[in-house]
Amino acid sequence: MIPWLEADDPFPHVSSALTEADGAAGLLAAGADLSTGRLLQAYKHGIFPWFSEGQPILWWSTDPRMVLFVENFRISASLKKKLKKIHHSITSRDGQWEIRFDHAFEEVMRACAAPRNGEGGTWISDEIIAGYTGLHKLGYAHSSELWLQGKLVGAAYGVSIGQMFYGESMFARVPDASKIALAYLVHFLRNHDVSMIDCQQETSHLATLGAAPIARTEFISRLRQAVSGPQISNWQPIALFPHD
């Protein structure tokens, strides 16, 4: 059994989360709300919400935890070629490609929520969107966006607390658009002394980008130090190839 949280109840310790033997590995609690205060409390303790339509709010702390150390981010040769093409387009100001941060945060979330490849909608409900746009307005949630001829074609978004970034979701409307947006995000975070991105759950796609699972105890230890760092305030893309 997991505890049901009322509005003012604190989260249980992450060590009490269910295990694989319980049939819902990482499930910690249910209930409460998605207010900005509750979400910030959750992320600072290594907890995240994840639930489907019709379910109560479910809170998770997975073990192991999938993370991307920014120094391990993998850029394939083909992706690097695309990144250079986009870099030259941006620097020449030809009006084709643009990288923007936080220009259309809610639009990014709704694009991430849209059905993909004939599947149903994602876990990103209107309730989730409202909660995270609230964080965005307070400077705690951000998007890295790729634009082509004035249209949003790909992005990644997540939560930023101190020197910790929590990746939430990505989408692409043209090939590799989400990877390109992520590459600019990782580059920006590296330049602001962020060493680790929380990816929450293990997937083969994240592994190809350099993410790997670590023990929850190690994750929480690193997290505590990172969230106590200074909050990043100047969210502007940084050129990937400054000398080209």
UniProtKB/Swiss-Prot annotation:
GO terms for biological process: protein catabolic process. It catalyses: N-terminal L-lysyl-[protein] + L-leucyl-tRNA(Leu) = N-terminal L-leucyl-L-lysyl-[protein] + tRNA(Leu) + H(+); N-terminal L-arginyl-[protein] + L-leucyl-tRNA(Leu) = N-terminal L-leucyl-L-arginyl-[protein] + tRNA(Leu) + H(+); L-phenylalanyl-tRNA(Phe) + an N-terminal L-alpha-aminoacyl-[protein] = an N-terminal L-phenylalanyl-L-alpha-aminoacyl-[protein] + tRNA(Phe). It comes from the Bacteria. Pfam families: Leu_Phe_trans. InterPro entries: Acyl_CoA_acyltransferase, Leu/Phe-tRNA_Trfase, Leu/Phe-tRNA_Trfase_C, Leu/Phe-tRNA_Trfase_N. Belongs to the L/F-transferase family. It is an enzyme of class 2 (transferase). The keyword Acyltransferase applies. This is Leucyl/phenylalanyl-tRNA--protein transferase. GO terms for cellular component: cytoplasm. Functions in the N-end rule pathway of protein degradation where it conjugates Leu, Phe and, less efficiently, Met from aminoacyl-tRNAs to the N-termini of proteins containing an N-terminal arginine or lysine. Its EC number is 2.3.2.6. Keywords: Acyltransferase, Cytoplasm, Transferase. It is found in: Cytoplasm. The keyword Lipoprotein does not apply. GO terms for molecular function: leucyl-tRNA--protein transferase activity. The gene is aat. Gene3D superfamilies: Leucyl/phenylalanyl-tRNA-protein transferase, C-terminal domain, Leucyl/phenylalanyl-tRNA-protein transferase, N-terminal domain.
